[in-house]
Amino acid sequence: MLEHRLSGEQNAGSEDRPIVIATLGTHGDVRPVIALGRGLQQRGHPVRVLTSENFAPLVKANGLAFFPLTGDHQRMLQVNPIRAGQSMWANCRMFRHHIASWARDWPSQGRAACADARLLIGVGSASILVDSLSQALQIPLVYAQLQPLTVSRHLPLVARPQLRLPGPLHVGLQHAMRFGGWQLLREVIDGSVRAPLGLPPYGWRGPDTSTIRVLYGYSEHLCPRPSDWPARIQVCGFWSLPQLQWQPPAALLDFLDAGPPPLYVGFGSMIDADAARLTTTVKAALRLTGQRALLATGWGGLIADQDVDSDQCFALEHAPHDWLFPRVIAAVHHGGAGTCAAALTAGIPSVVVPFGYDQPFWAHCLAQRGVAPPALKRDGLQPEVLAHALRQATSPTMCAAAQALGQRLREEDGVAKAVAQLEQWGLLRDAGIVRQHADVVC
C-alpha cells in the first residue's frame, strides 16, 4: 500500500507536501510546537499546525498554516478549575469526559489536514490521533513530546516524582500507570477515532510503544537522557518561541525602574478554584519578605484587586516570559515545562507551586539542579512557608546556580537539533519516507 503511495504520484511535487504537527493543550503545549514548525519551515518544509481554534491567531502570526482540531483546554480548565488536593484520578476522569466529546470531530478534521501530508508529528494528547491517521493514510510519523513519557529505570514518575521503587518495580509501575491511562481512554479512541478511520481497535493492551521515534523538547541539562533509552529516543533541548512585536505598557516599565528587580508571581494557564485564597497567601508572604513583585493573573490562577501596595506589587494579566524574566530576580509559578524553560533560560531561580499534570516532575528537576527550593503544596499553603521559599530562591547561592545553568541552556538550540535529527532519520527526504510500524503513543 505504501509502495503505491511512494510511486511517481507521490514523488511528483512531493517537496511541496506539508508536514503536519498536531497538538492540544495550553500555551505551554502549543508554543513549543509552533517554534518547531518555524524551524522546519525555515529549512524549506511547509508546515501545518493542527490544534484548537483559540490558537489560530498565534499559529498564523508565525507564518504557519492553521487547521482546526476540536479541544479547548482553556475552556476545560474554566469549567473544571483545579482544586487544591484534587486527586490525579479525578483529573483523569474529567479529562476523559472532555476527550469523549472532542474526539468525535477528530477523524474528519485529521483527514482534512493530513490527507496530502508527507510527515505527521504528534504531540501530547493528539499523539494517538496522529498514530491512527498515520495508519489510515499510510503516512510516516514521529512523536515530539514535551515531558519524558518513555519508560525508564532511571527517571522518576512524571506525576509522582517523589515515589521511587527498586528498578524492576519502578519500570513495572510505569507500565501499570500507562495501562490504566489507556483503559480510561480505550473506548473513546477505539470507537470515536479508529472506527471512523476504518481501523480495527487497538485492543485491551493498548498502543505498542516499542518502535516509534520520539523527539523530546526539553534540555538534558535539566533532565539527563537515561542510559536505558534506545537511539530512536532523542532529547533535543527546549523549543522556545520568542514573542513577536510585544510592547510593554509604560506603567510596567515605570514599576521595573522604580526599584530592585522584583519577583514574578504567576500561574500561567492554570485556573485555581480558590484563586482569592491563593492571591491572599501570596500577598501575605510578600509582606513578610518585603520584596517587590509582579502579579500575573494569567487565565485565573491569581486575582487582580485594589488591595495591593502599588510600591510593592504591580498587577498584570500577561507579559512574554522571554521579555520579562531577565528583568526579575526569581519566578513563582506552577511548574509548566514552558515556564520552567523560560526561567532557566533567563538564569533566574524558581519557586514552584504545582497544580498537577507534569508540573511536580519539573519542580523535582529544578530542585535537583539547585535552582529551586522543594515544590510547595498548594493545598493549605501558608504565607510563612511561601516566604521561606522566596528567601531561599533569592539567596546568592541559588541565584548563582540559576545563572550558571541559564548560560548552558542559552548555548543550546533545541529546534535546530530536532530538525537535524529528523534529517538524520531520513524523515525530511522524500527518498527516505518509509513508514515504520506504529501502533502507539510514546
Per-region residue spans from a language model:
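N-terminal subdomain of nucleotide-sugar transferases
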Residues: L2-A65
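C-terminal amphipathic helix plus adjacent low-complexity
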Residues: L2-R5, D116, D379, P383-C442
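Donor-nucleotide binding loops and adjacent catalytic segments primarily
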Residues: E15, Y218, L222-A330, Q436
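A donor-sugar binding/catalytic signature common to diverse glycosyltransferases
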Residues: D29, G37, L120-G122, L316-H364
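Conserved nucleotide-sugar phosphate-binding/catalytic loop shared by glycosyltransferases and other
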Residues: R48-M94, P166-V171
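Conserved nucleotide-sugar donor-interacting segment of glycosyltransferase catalytic cores
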Residues: A103-V171, H221-L222
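Long, low-complexity segments enriched in small/aliphatic residues
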Residues: R186-F238
